[in-house]
Design a protein with these regions (language model features):
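Canonical Radical SAM [4Fe-4S] cluster-binding loop centered on the CxxxCxxC motif
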Residues: 2-51
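Short acidic/His/Gly/Ser-rich catalytic and metal-binding motifs that mark active-site loops
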Residues: 26-29, 132-135, 207-209
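Core AdoMet radical
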Residues: 34-79, 91-106, 120-149, 169, ...
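Alpha-helix N-cap and loop-to-helix initiation/capping positions
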Residues: 43-48, 140-148, 179-186, 212-219
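Acidic (Asp/Glu)-rich catalytic clusters
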Residues: 59-62, 87-91, 111-121, 157-163, ...
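Distinct, well-ordered alpha-helical segments
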Residues: 79-88, 106-116, 181-184
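Conserved C-terminal portion of the radical SAM core fold
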Residues: 147-210, 223-237
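Class I (Rossmann-like) S-adenosyl-L-methionine-dependent methyltransferase catalytic domain
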Residues: 243-244
Length: 244
């Protein structure tokens, strides 16, 4: 999955850069496959990401993209400084999307990102996955209780009052055994009132220890398409591969 690609979907034309990351500091979500592509080797992470960022910059020279999305399978703030610095040229004057766990996000950290990258807009994606706290904490083991959910909601409102060009988007997970369809629907209805955008993610099982995939109804598929900003059904570009 590492690399760059252009995509044109409900969010418009985007340039996506999927970077190599260090293992997530939390690392206990029981469905997450991203450790497969991560590394403890700092040199490996730095030089892999230099190559990917250079590819992205070359693409920008040939094609116009207003929206740049950067993913690294953990939190943006866990990337090495070399990578953080080299992303400035990609981010400046673009709509810049990153992913993060909630604990890294506060008014100081996001103001620092705005100052450093000077994006047209900063979009922060957070994987709360489901509104139901018992499912999120006891079954998915996310480590993001409702206190964090409410804190990020208050932060979103504070950012709006300050007039900062920042949006908070959340992921909702579906097609996984622990989250019944009615809880997926509940999550979307609640999160639509709380945050700026929702992306629904179809779960894919990668490891034997991971929860099972479950089929979804036509009703849920239609509901997702009509009530979220994007449904990520998966695709070849998102396949995670072990790279030793």
């Amino acid at each position: 999955m590492l690399g760059t690609f252009s995509i044109n979907d409900k969010l418009g034309k985007r340039l996506v850069a999927i970077l190599k990351g260090f293992p997530c500091s939390w690392g206990r979500c029981n469905f997450c496959p991203f450790a497969i592509e991560q590394s403890f080797n700092t040199r490996d992470v730095i030089f892999t990401n230099r190559r990917i960022i250079n590819e992205a910059l070359k693409t920008l020279e040939k094609e116009d993209h207003k929206r740049i999305a950067v993913f690294n399978g953990s939190s943006f703030h866990e990337l090495p400084y070399d990578t953080i610095e080299k992303l400035r040229e990609l981010a400046k004057r673009h709509i810049f999307e990153i992913e993060s766990r909630s604990e890294y996000i506060n008014i100081s950290s996001i103001e620092a990102l705005l100052s450093y990258y000077e994006p047209e807009k900063l979009i922060i994606r957070i994987g709360f996955e489901v509104y139901d706290e018992k499912i999120r904490e006891n079954l998915l083991n996310k480590g993001m209780p409702n206190t964090e959910l409410q804190r990020i909601y208050r932060l979103k409102n504070e950012v709006k009052e300050l007039g900062l060009p920042i949006e908070f988007w959340v992921y909702v997970l579906f097609g996984i055994e622990y989250i019944p369809e009615e809880k997926v629907i509940e999550s979307i209805k609640v999160f639509k009132k709380m945050f700026d955008g929702i992306i629904a993610i179809k779960y894919k099982k990668y490891l034997p220890s991971h929860p099972k995939e479950v089929p979804i109804s036509e009703y849920l598929a239609k509901f997702l398409e009509e009530n979220t900003d994007l449904v990520d059904w998966g695709g070849e570009q998102w396949i995670i591969e072990r790279r030793d």
